[in-house]
Amino acid sequence: NKILLYMKGSPDKPQCGFSQRATQILMACGKEFSFVDILSNPDIRETLPTVSNWPTFPQLYIEGELIGGSDIMMDMYQNGELKKLIDDVEI
């Protein structure tokens, strides 16, 4: 999955405001993305913050690289960086 969002809930039913904002940003970028609901996957919810060295969710990965959470996504979206990064991904 080249664009992967670890989030609370699903894009159709996000379970927190940050996850909702992250999915809205990704949808606005216009490319298909995958997601993992960490509420349904407690092992991932416990392990990923340690592995990624990022304590909160959502977490966006593009081509295996951690981009950040919803605040970073919003900043990058507003300045055009995120759309460019996503546009460069071949799915």
Describe the residue ranges of each PLM region.
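Thiol-based oxidoreductase modules, predominantly thioredoxin-like and allied folds used
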Residues: 27-47, 55
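Local sequence-structure signature of Cys/Sec-based thiol-disulfide redox active-site neighborhoods
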Residues: 1-32
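Structured beta-strand/turn binding interfaces of compact recognition modules in eukaryotic regulators
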Residues: 6-8, 36-41, 54, 63, ...
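Short amphipathic alpha-helical molecular recognition features
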Residues: 14-18, 36, 40, 58, ...
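Non-catalytic, surface beta->alpha helical segment in thiol-disulfide oxidoreductase systems
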Residues: 62-91
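Structural micro-motif
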Residues: 2-4, 51-62, 68-71
